[in-house]
Each structure stands twice: as C-alpha cells, then as structure tokens.
C-alpha cells in the first residue's frame, strides 16, 4: 500500500519535471486546489490543469520540502492529512526567486488519483 508521503514525493517530482499530466493524475475529479500563486479556489480539473500549465511553463521550476516540517495525520484507514512547508523556486526575468509556502493536503490512498484537497499559500511577512 502506498504511503501518504509517497503521494507528496510524486507530486514534487512531477512539479520538478514540469509534467502537467503527472500532476493531474494525482488529483481526484472532485479535488479542490487553493494554489500558492493564485487568488482563486480551483475546484474543477480544467482550472487545476490551466494553473499547472502556467506554473510549469516557468523557467528553472523546482520545489524543495523542508523535511522537518512534514506532519502526517491519519484520519481513517486510507485517508490522511499532511501539512508542512516547502520552497518554490523559478526564474522571473532571468532571476531565480524563492517562495516559501505552507501547505496542506487531504489524500485518500484508496483512490487512483489520491489528492482530494490541496492548499498552499506563501508564508507572509511577520508584523
């Protein structure tokens, strides 16, 4: 049986490869994505695909997990919540920029496309 952490690693690998198809294969048809770089809630596969098509077109796109921040919470036998912090990197106008973001997922490992909910937001500056 797959572990929830493996879903996250598959997702990160797909981001690093810029593979929209591999990303979409992880999102259930009912999935909701609250993305890092959008002010919209995406609850249709078409809008999730459009978001990742735009994001994956970025030069030097990568993502790195801050391993010590990852927490996995079992909600039932097959359903898990995960949260933590990762760092997006990509180039804008030739300059490589980094964006720290907090994330949460709800995954159902009994489904072929296990991601049901994914929220990611840039970490704001402290007041």
Predicted segment positions?
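A generic structural micro-feature
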Residues: 61-64, 76-80, 95-99
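A short, structured loop/turn motif at beta-sheet edges
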Residues: 72-80, 107-114
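Short, solvent-exposed loop/turn segments at secondary-structure boundaries
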Residues: 37, 93-96
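Hydrophobic/aromatic beta-strand elements that line small-molecule binding cavities or substrate pockets
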Residues: 52, 67-72, 86-88, 101-108
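A solvent-exposed, acidic/Ser-Thr-rich amphipathic alpha-helical stretch
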Residues: 2, 20-74
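Short, aromatic-enriched amphipathic alpha-helices that serve as compact interaction elements
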Residues: 1-18, 26
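A short hydrophobic beta-strand element
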Residues: 78-88
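Short beta-strand edge/turn micro-motifs at domain boundaries
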Residues: 98-127
């Amino acid at each position: 049986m797959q572990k929830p952490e493996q879903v996250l690693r598959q997702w990160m690998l797909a981001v690093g490869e810029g593979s929209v198809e591999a990303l979409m294969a992880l999102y259930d048809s009912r999935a909701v994505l609250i993305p890092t770089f959008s002010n919209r809630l995406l609850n249709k596969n078409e809008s999730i695909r459009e978001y990742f098509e735009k994001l994956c077109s970025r030069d030097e796109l990568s993502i790195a997990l801050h391993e010590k921040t990852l927490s996995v919470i079992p909600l039932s036998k097959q359903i898990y919540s995960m949260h933590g912090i990762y760092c997006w990197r990509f180039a804008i106008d030739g300059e490589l920029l980094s964006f720290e973001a907090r994330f949460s997922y709800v995954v159902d490992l009994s489904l072929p496309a296990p991601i049901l909910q994914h929220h990611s937001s840039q970490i704001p500056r402290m007041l």
